């Protein structure tokens, strides 16, 4: 039987220790090309066991938060936090009450590298009577210091550093937070401490050394290096395909890849009927999951009558650039009995080089016949297939 597991992501802090030069809270500073909170939220969104996500933010951060997470706006709930972490957590728990989850993760918004493996290990350890805490053994020698002098060395045996997410049965941790508020107990540094105080047992599991919390300015350097390494290991390369077909009508030229080709017929279409650029536009849109050319430029709209298909291609390209995409290569196959494409291939490649800003070795344009089969074989029209490979920032999700 499946269980319902929610997540509360705490992002209401000001992050003064991280030292932002632009006074931007650290969770909204860029890591790679996306804010830290974007990376954190993504980790929970992509895990199939997480049913509900509550994002607790500072009241002044709603606009910047909504901008940072615009593409996910339907997939999480924003709750305003309080003056302390403990109060913010209670706000998140109270907002979750109507969803009645069985368990809840409570996670620091400034820990962007939580992996599915750790979440799975937590879920496999859950019971209705216990919470789960990921921990790491302390490797440094610990000293108790007073006024810059060492008082004693503290044995490391049985000492661990705590990470988040910390996961709890929902009702007990909500009750613990409510009880702490009632008795004005406000000095807890994490939710595990509240659970301990309330009498809820906490079982530990091995944490992940890469699951760092970005607290100090130097932590950004560590995070950037780790992200770069991850991107090199699992680059987010996406492949899109496009297909288009247009019939012939009377005319004296047609346009392919933006190049005018003399012919005794032209292609019938609402725009200039550049079947090759239409297929390529669809291929590029596919890498963003952005629909097809008809979604953006409906043929029922008279403003696109007889316009150059380069407009459509440049629009798709702008969507790629907004997401930080870079074209790795494009491949177009024109399927036609006539006209012959060979004499115009070089001009087509040069035109695409200009539009796409890529080198010719990343552009393939070729043609084939349909061996006189079907409507293409009968010379009734032209079809085109296109494939595009685009590299986006970030890594491939697990």
Swiss-Prot record:
This is Bifunctional enzyme IspD/IspF. Bifunctional enzyme that catalyzes the formation of 4-diphosphocytidyl-2-C-methyl-D-erythritol from CTP and 2-C-methyl-D-erythritol 4-phosphate (MEP) (IspD), and catalyzes the conversion of 4-diphosphocytidyl-2-C-methyl-D-erythritol 2-phosphate (CDP-ME2P) to 2-C-methyl-D-erythritol 2,4-cyclodiphosphate (ME-CPP) with a corresponding release of cytidine 5-monophosphate (CMP) (IspF). Residues 1-237 are annotated as: 2-C-methyl-D-erythritol 4-phosphate cytidylyltransferase. Its EC number is 2.7.7.60, 4.6.1.12. Gene3D superfamilies: 2-C-methyl-D-erythritol 2,4-cyclodiphosphate synthase, Spore Coat Polysaccharide Biosynthesis Protein SpsA, Chain A. Pfam families: IspD, YgbB. SUPFAM superfamilies: IpsF-like (SSF69765), Nucleotide-diphospho-sugar transferases (SSF53448). 4-CDP-2-C-methyl-D-erythritol 2-phosphate binds at residues 244-246, 270-271, 292-294, 368-371, 375, 378. It catalyses: 2-C-methyl-D-erythritol 4-phosphate + CTP + H(+) = 4-CDP-2-C-methyl-D-erythritol + diphosphate; 4-CDP-2-C-methyl-D-erythritol 2-phosphate = 2-C-methyl-D-erythritol 2,4-cyclic diphosphate + CMP. HAMAP family: IspD, IspDF, IspF. The keyword Metal-binding applies. InterPro entries: IspD, IspD/F, IspD/TarI, MECDP_synthase, MECDP_synthase_CS, MECDP_synthase_sf, Nucleotide-diphossugar_trans. In the N-terminal section; belongs to the IspD/TarI cytidylyltransferase family. IspD subfamily. Pathway: Isoprenoid biosynthesis; isopentenyl diphosphate biosynthesis via DXP pathway; isopentenyl diphosphate from 1-deoxy-D-xylulose 5-phosphate: step 2/6; Isoprenoid biosynthesis; isopentenyl diphosphate biosynthesis via DXP pathway; isopentenyl diphosphate from 1-deoxy-D-xylulose 5-phosphate: step 4/6. Residues 238-398 are annotated as: 2-C-methyl-D-erythritol 2,4-cyclodiphosphate synthase. Keywords: Isoprene biosynthesis, Lyase, Metal-binding, Multifunctional enzyme, Nucleotidyltransferase, Transferase. The record marks 17, 26, 270, 369 as: Transition state stabilizer. The record marks 156, 213 as: Positions MEP for the nucleophilic attack. One of its GO terms (molecular function) is 2-C-methyl-D-erythritol 4-phosphate cytidylyltransferase activity. A divalent metal cation binds at residues 244, 246, 278. Its cofactor is a divalent metal cation. It comes from Bartonella tribocorum (strain CIP 105476 / IBS 506). One of its GO terms (biological process) is terpenoid biosynthetic process. Signal peptide: none annotated. The gene is ispDF.
